Amino acid sequence: LLGAERMIERYSAKIEKRPYYMAEQILPYLEQLQKNGITAQKDPLRVTVLFSGDTGFYSGCRKLYVALQEAVAVGALNAGVRILPGISSVATLAARVGESYEDAAILSMHGKKLNRLSTTVESHEKVFLLTSGSEDIRKIGHLLAEAGLTDCEVIAGYQLSYPEESIRILTPGQCEEITEEGLYTCLIRNPHWQPER
């Protein structure tokens, strides 16, 4: 079982677990298993890589999939590869708060700068955001306040699907005070949105 530490820690120690989630870590590991003959057993070895969130939306899953397919194509790896999607954090938050998302903008701050947040919020009633943690929540609050979007409501889904899950309804100012680390997915509601012209 491979994946980020937080993804694999809950699973039994009866199976081999490695905190690998990047292609650069996983490919050498799989190639070594194959070299050691472990994959040549009568019953094929099954290796699972866990990713959080949506497998098709700013996920490391795509990069790993491409790398695995390339390794199979050149004969470096004898494997079958398939993706089994989970439930995205956007879908989870939308369900928790009874909101649709077919008419929402969906953006990611996960590991990158988001320069167009205020213009997107100005032109959409609903904006869902994937974040990297509390620092991004503070940035959201700062960007909204700086753009004069202080009437917006920020619904922060904290640790969705984990036992400590909570839904927090915040003002931009309250966002700037968030310090609790963890996984956040946000929904920003703008009561004064105007469609783009």
Q: Which residue stretches match the model-derived regions?
A:
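General beta-strand structural signal in soluble alpha/beta enzymes
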Residues: 2-4, 49-51, 81-86, 106-108, ...
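Class I SAM-dependent methyltransferase SAM-binding "motif I" and its flanking Rossmann-like core
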Residues: 53-124
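A contiguous loop/helix-start segment that scaffolds small-molecule binding in enzyme catalytic cores
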Residues: 47, 123-197
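Predominant activation on well-ordered alpha-helical scaffold segments within soluble catalytic domains
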Residues: 27, 31, 62-65, 91-95, ...
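Class I S-adenosyl-L-methionine
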Residues: 1-81
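Short, charged, surface-exposed secondary-structure boundary motifs
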Residues: 9-13, 25-31, 91-94, 113-118, ...
